[in-house]
Swiss-Prot record:
Assembly notes: Part of the 30S ribosomal subunit.
Lineage: Eukaryota, Viridiplantae, Streptophyta, Embryophyta, Tracheophyta
Protein name per the record: Small ribosomal subunit protein uS7cz/uS7cy
GO terms classed as biological process: translation
Family the entry assigns: Belongs to the universal ribosomal protein uS7 family.
MF annotations from Gene Ontology: rRNA binding; structural constituent of ribosome
Keyword tags: Chloroplast, Plastid, Ribonucleoprotein, Ribosomal protein, RNA-binding, rRNA-binding
UniProt KW Plastid keyword: yes
Record's GO cellular component terms: chloroplast; small ribosomal subunit
Main location: plastid
Length: 155
């Protein structure tokens, strides 16, 4: 048994303009090659575009989109007796938000469009409305978990 203690969970810092942790999590996931200022630019432009499209509070749209995409359950591959089973496991809120952000960014990168800010804003608005690729990904994950419910006792 390990003698090492459990790692302290780091809380995400908030971003300088909106003072929001979700925005900072989004910035850190969109980041490529250490260009954080560019990541901030993309996020802030996307937030402005959301403001123009919906004429509501863009942070509430962001919160609603992430809440809509966050999965409650996922499947994990587990090897039992020579065969690999997809075992459904519950996901905590922090891990769920991280997955949701990852799916939102992947879906927005796939989208056709002018630039990343435009694609991200479109995906966030769609996710807040309950449509889009990220929502489809969450539903697919939930369907997989439901289909493999018989293997839940392998946890």
């Amino acid at each position: 048994m390990s003698r090492r203690g459990t790692a302290e969970e780091k809380t995400a810092k908030s971003d300088p303009i909106y003072r929001n942790r979700l925005v900072n999590m989004l910035v850190n996931r969109i980041l490529k090659h250490g260009k954080k200022s560019l990541a901030y630019q993309i996020i802030y432009r996307a937030v402005k575009k959301i403001q123009q499209k919906t004429e509501t509070n863009p942070l509430s749209v962001l919160r609603q989109a992430i809440h809509g995409v966050t999965p409650g359950i996922a499947v994990k591959a587990r090897r039992v007796g020579g065969s690999t089973h997809q075992v459904p496991i519950e996901i905590g809120s922090t891990q769920g938000k991280a997955l949701a952000i990852r799916w939102l960014l992947a879906a927005s990168r796939k989208r056709p469009g002018r630039n990343m800010a435009f694609k991200l804003s479109s995906e966030l608005v769609d996710a807040a409305k309950g449509s889009g690729d990220a929502i489809r990904k969450r539903e697919e994950t939930h369907r997989m978990a439901e289909a493999n419910r018989a293997f839940a006792h392998f946890r």
